[in-house]
């Protein structure tokens, strides 16, 4: 495939996430303050939509559902996080964010998670 327009860089505020549609593939653009990442729209843990549950602070993306976190600069897994965050190659040209999308990035999910680690569930 080729480079695909995602959005203007100015459309994604610092420390925020924006869900975009790139030729029928949903992508989340993450602005971590000093740069951008293009990632699949769901957390690799439990299929939680990152545009709704993701929070960025100090260059770290955290899914608030189960507190999995990744450093958006190094992509290092933080804390109890068990799976890497997949990313699309991204570049900025003339204020526009473009991703190289050869195929949709997806995760394999395990069915046996019983949600006991759901920090926000009601007991």
From Swiss-Prot:
Reactions mediated catalytically: methanesulfonate + NADH + O2 = sulfite + formaldehyde + NAD(+) + H2O
Cofactors (names): [2Fe-2S] cluster
Domain of life: Bacteria
Annotated localization: Cytoplasm
Gene3D superfamilies from the UniProt entry: Rieske [2Fe-2S] iron-sulphur domain
Cofactor descriptive note: Binds 1 [2Fe-2S] cluster per subunit.
Activity: how regulated: MSAMO is inhibited by metal chelators (such as bathophenanthroline, bathocuprione, neocuprione, alpha-alpha-dipyridil and sodium EDTA) and by sodium azide, sodium arsenate and potassium cyanide.
Pfam families, alphabetized: Rieske
Binding-site residues for [2Fe-2S] cluster, renumbered to this chain: 43, 45, 63, 66
Enzyme kind, highest EC tier: oxidoreductase
Signal sequence, renumbered to the chain: none
GO cellular component term of the entry, any: cytoplasm
Keywords carried by this UniProt record: 2Fe-2S, Cytoplasm, Electron transport, Iron, Iron-sulfur, Metal-binding, Monooxygenase, NAD, Oxidoreductase, Transport
InterPro entries: Rieske_2Fe-2S, Rieske_2Fe-2S_sf
EC number: 1.14.13.111
GO molecular function, one term: 2 iron, 2 sulfur cluster binding
Main localization (coarse): cytoplasm
Domain Rieske, chain residue ranges per copy: 4-99
Factors inducing expression: The msmABCD operon is induced by methanesulfonic acid (MSA).
Oligomeric and partner information: The MSA monooxygenase system consists of 4 proteins: the 2 subunits of the hydroxylase component (MsmA and MsmB), a ferredoxin (MsmC) and a ferredoxin reductase (MsmD). The ferredoxin component is dimeric.
Similarity remark: Belongs to the bacterial ring-hydroxylating dioxygenase ferredoxin component family.
Function: Methanesulfonate monooxygenase (MSAMO) mediates the primary degradation of methanesulfonic acid (MSA) to produce formaldehyd and inorganic sulfite by initial hydroxylation of the carbon atom prior to spontaneous cleavage of the unstable hydroxymethanesulfonic acid. MSAMO has a restricted substrate range that includes only the short-chain aliphatic sulfonates (methane- to butanesulfonate) and excludes all larger molecules, such as arylsulfonates and aromatic sulfonates. All MSAMO components are required for enzyme activity.
Identification of the protein by name: Methanesulfonate monooxygenase ferredoxin subunit
Naturally occurring in which organism (per UniProt): Methylosulfonomonas methylovora
